[in-house]
Each structure stands twice: as C-alpha cells, then as structure tokens.
C-alpha cells in the first residue's frame, strides 16, 4: 500500500490527484475509490493510504486517511 498527499480534489466533479511519497507520477483518484460511507471527498494536503492500479495512467484504489 502506498502513501501520499492529496494535491487537489474537486468534490463537484468527484476526482483529483495524489502526490506519492517518495516521488513518482501523480496518481488519479476518483470518488468511488475512497473508502468511506456517505459523501466521499478528500481535502487538499490530506495524507492518505492507497493502492496503485494502472488504467490510462496510475490510479488510486482503496483510498483511506493515513
């Protein structure tokens, strides 16, 4: 499982990007990948744990607060 910091997240559009700790490309995150009940959103500079999968680029899955 990787750790990173939310660069930005647009709650209206339901997606954003996470900067990986230790470098590497930014990781796309969709609201459906956030492990939460109710309204799923992330805050800028929030530290999160996530799994990286690959679609058109790196994508986050199983996102949860660190």
Curated annotation (Swiss-Prot):
Classification via InterPro entries: Cold_shock_CspA, Cold_shock_domain, CSD, CSD_CS, CSP_DNA-bd, NA-bd_OB-fold
CDD domains in alphabetical order: CSP_CDS
Entry's Gene Ontology molecular function annotations: DNA binding
Keywords: Activator, Cytoplasm, DNA-binding, Stress response, Transcription, Transcription regulation
Compartments where located: Cytoplasm
Pfam families membership: CSD (PF00313)
Keyword DNA-binding: yes
Induction: In response to low temperature.
GO CC terms, sorted: cytoplasm
Name of the molecule in the record: Cold shock-like protein 7.0
Organism phylogeny: Bacteria, Bacillati, Actinomycetota, Actinomycetes, Kitasatosporales
